[in-house]
Amino acid sequence: MAEPRRVAFISLSPVRRREADFAGAEREPPRLEPQPYREPARAEPAPRADAQPPARDKPLPQREVSRAEPPMALQREPPRPEPPPPPLPLQTPPPRESASRAEPPPRPPKETVRLELVLKDPTDESCVEFSYPELLLCGEQRKKLVHTEDPFTDEHKERQEVEMLAKKFEMKYGGKARKHRKDRLQDLIDIGFGYDETDPFIDNSEAYDELVPASLTTKYGGFYINTGTLQFRQASDTEEDDFTDNQKHKPPKVPKIKEDDIEVKKRKRKEEGEKEKKPRKKVPKQLGVVALNSHKSEKKKKRYKDSLSLAAMIRKFQKEKDALKKESTPKVPVTPSSSSLPKPPCVTTALGDDIPDLGLNSADPDLPIFVSTNEHELFQEAENALEMLDDFDFDRLLDATSDGSPLSESGGENGNTTHPTFPSQVVPKVVPTLPEGLPVLLEKRIEDLRVAAKLFDEEGRKKFFTQDMNNILLDIELQLQELGPVIRSGVYSHLEAFVPCNKETLVKRLKKLHLNVQDDRLREPLQKLKLAVSNVMPEQLFKYQEDCQARSQAKCAKLQADEEREKNGSDDDDDEKPGKRVIGPRKKFHWDDTIRTLLCNLVEIKLGCYELEPNKSQSAEDYLKSFMETEVKPLWPKGWMQARMLFKESRSVHNHLTSAPAKKKVIPASKPKVKECSPKKDPKAPASVVASGGGPSTSSSTSIVASASSSSAPAQETICLDDSLDEDLSFPSASLDLVSEALAVINNGNKGPSVGSRLNVPTTKPRPGLREEKLASIMSKLPLATPKKLDSTQTAHSSSLIAGHTGPVPKKPQDLAHTGISSGLIAGSSIQNPKVSLEPLPARLLQQGLQRSSQIHASSSSQTHVSSSQAQAAASSHALGTSEAQDASSLTQVTKVHQHSAVQQNYVSPLQATISKSQTNPVVKLSNNPQLSCSSQLLKTSDKPLMYRLPLSTPSPGNGSQGPHPLVSRTAPSTTTSSNYLAKAMVSQISTQGFKSPFSMAASPKLAASPKPATSPKPLPSPKPSVSPKPSLSAKPSISTKQISKSNPAPKPAVCPSSSSPNTLVAQSSHSTSNNPVHKQPSGMNISRQSPTLNLLPSNRTSGLPTTKTLQAPSKLTNSSSTGTAGKNSLSGIPMNVPASRGSNLNSSGANRTSLSGGTGSGTQGATKPLSTPHRPTSASGSSVVTASVQSTAGASLLANASPLTLMTSPLSVTNQTVTPFGMLGGLVPVTMPFQFPLELLGFGTDTAGVTATSGSTSAALHHSLTQNLLKSLQPGAQHAAALPHSPLPAHLQQAFNDGGQSKGDTKLPRKPQ
């Protein structure tokens, strides 16, 4: 089968072949025998192929010649060499041959045809198919083509082709048409059978049957729809023939029945179908009452064309009833016209089967249609129908009779054939009595209606509801509106007897009339309003035209000027080009009282119509708006009025109906806004923070908050996220004042009276110890009470803690406590504010801090001497965003503490040195403030907030200083650690305070450092990550950070950004600490130990920029050592590492960090490399370095708590407070706080001399470098990096740090759980 085979087909059937063979036999009897050919044809084609050749030797040539088929001859030969293949194709044709055997016999035998077929291998999609008849036809056509040599045979051939084509189409499309007529008889009986009367789309409420006698037919024949008058005509034979011919197309069976019978049957079926439908209707129906007078139909038809009075109708019914009685008494009489028509029994039985309810007792075709089996039943049905129809629908009844329908007299309104048995049934119809106690006027109008209805019946009418009748009905309706529903219903029932409609229709009609009257009432006000508008419009149109002319003139002048400029080649008009598109003056209609009053009157009337609306599908607002759009608005010229303006101007009238929904909509919208601003109960937070410094945490740090609010309230009030950049500029004076006061306090050695005076709370400075105790107690309570309010409460806590830290230090120096509180409050307030107000407050505080720090650094960089380290610390704390007051207080406290105890002074000296360096190094400052924030958060977050403070107190004594001194020392270290931790915590918060504390820190530092150029956006991202970990707190800190970032640039570029960033970090870190209360509690413990650490840190800080990190590192060391001396030693040992870490942090952090560590270029770089390695592993980015520094500073106390916050360091785990700081230092040492937290605050308790000696040079150097670094940090990030001496930080580490700052949110979030 690979190659196509050519198979011989014999087209003739075996019968034909036989005939052909016999013909051949006659010609050559000896050779041709029928059998050999029959068998091959029937059974095996192959044998036939073998047998045929000898037999065809002679006959075939003759046939071929006669056929003149050279092509067929060619076709015949191929199969001979291939006899075997034929069986395959020949097996398929045999059935077709057998099918065609029946038809061919009469036709002359066809000659044998050989077909050559090409068989192809079948595929999955197709196989070879052949149609034997088509092949034969093709063969015949070929024959004709061959034989058509005679040109005169063309016509004959064409005719044959056309006939073949016609037959083909007839067989295809026209066949089997008559086969369906056998079973269609029942279809003619009820053509409407199957019609769903329950379908809501079909309204049969007013339909009724008209029984058509057999002698009549509709004017145009067939069914009709009940619209208008039904016209009848006498049935005629020709019409019947035509009618039946038309019907034949539908039921082909008609020819079998006589046409007359069919005609009658059809009519009967039609009418019976309608009758059958009738019983399905609501009212029972009387069958065939009128059929008996069908012989009188012609006369009646003429009579009914005229309007009939009720009396005439009754008389007519009575006559028909009598006739019916007479004819139906003996038997059911047959109508003369119908009896003349013969009825085949088949039809009768068919009808009887189809209409069993008609009980056919006679073969008469009309009986089943018109007469009920029982006369009594017939009349009984009529009586029932009359009773059910309380009243005739005279209107319809008369209209139907006037239409000329002989049967309409029996047509009731509801489709019932109502034929009264007695005249009394119609005339005395039961009329419901009127309710008692009706108004006299109403009764009079009802009587008028009765009279009018009576006149209408007597005179006959075309229309019942005339204008007079409508007026009477409307008057009745208006009076009924004042009566109760029961009385109204009774009156309606009474009126129903006098109107040609039922009660429901009457009620609807009355309501419609009432509404129409209301609409009529609108016409006059509408007309008045239109007149008023038309009187006013000319003037306004004139003004509008003048405006248009002036505008066009101005436009032309401008175009000319523009053309001149273009000719001159001037580019000055570039800015004005957008203005070239001049829009014409607005078509603004100016209202006056008259028009407004007219509009209100119109709307009031329309509202009255709305009240009358039975189905109020629209709300009052939509109803009025659509009315104004369609009816009122067109009163103005096009374009001069809008529907919304009409609605607005008429609000005084419809406000009671349309205002409620609007209010509902507005209320929900406002609530979300409040939530967004302060997710944690803090919508009022900004105000409270401004007023009290720590809205949510006012209870714990109320005094501190108050002082902070007094010092930073103005900045907080004005600072908003949106205005943060401008806010920085707007409040530099306050920051400068605070800074100057703090400097004065530091220089004078006072306890910060000026700061105290600034701070409302500072007045309590004399009782720093008490304040610290209160703060500690409040803080301890707040964490527990405010865990849910992390955002507001934690922020408050952080601020309070910052203040508290400052406060604790002030325990020894009251001024320091006051100034520390004020600065801490400012920082805390800004932190609290972030929490309370979500963002604005922290931004403000940071901005203030930045401004103050920048101012302090700029103005008092030289003033910071030995004290200058403290002063710088204060300035840095201000920069951090704590507050200048806090800074000053810390300095003052430090000074006093130094004076009070030499031991504490020793510790404080390192702290102060660290603080001064931290001032110089934004990181150090940041770490300080963050520590405060962290500590406050620790107190809040954990049940150990008190523990945190207590550890502070205890460690300070452990340090070997006096109780107060240890407190101060402790406070200072705690503050330092707190600030560091806060920085860290803030960073971790920003980064979701958990997993990558370093990244978090780095991000936070970036926020602080780069706030000035482009870092402010980065801080934002970091806060956002923190938001996810702590939605409420984090979100607020992030916002505050953004604000701070923005404000930082505005204030002095160098210090301000750092300080504000630190504040932000502090706030965030505090948030993060609150998130990890357990860790934070250990942090508290560490902080208490850290007081020595802080002292040690100062020595590190003395080194330079690295001091910040050094401070952090020493914090951890101190925590581990737990003793002030050991802490100091550790600090001295750590300084280089910390600076290195810080340097790396600064490098990683970017411009911010660079600016911070600018002062300690070489030292920081050296430290940066070592730290960078641990930092990278820990946080894979500069962020972790920053966190490390924060953690290291806060490590002992806050870092442990921040360990979770510090994603970086597992060593910061709560369990290992002492070790944690070290681990953090090792891993996180590179952490450089972009924000400078006032480390001086942390080192309040250090001896002035010690601080001066230890950190004097460092302080001066740090301050100088810090100012430079801060300025650089304010500059673009690239510049910062270049300026940083920490650039030696590995490029990959720096990049990782920067990347970490950007992606800290994502990376930190995963780590936060750690």
Swiss-Prot record:
The modification N6-acetyllysine is found at K1036, K1116. Pfam families: HUN, UBN_AB. The keyword Ubl conjugation applies. GO terms for cellular component: nucleoplasm. Residues 330-341, 685-709, 849-879, 1003-1013, 1029-1040 have a biased composition (Low complexity). Belongs to the ubinuclein family. This is Ubinuclein-2. It comes from Mus musculus.
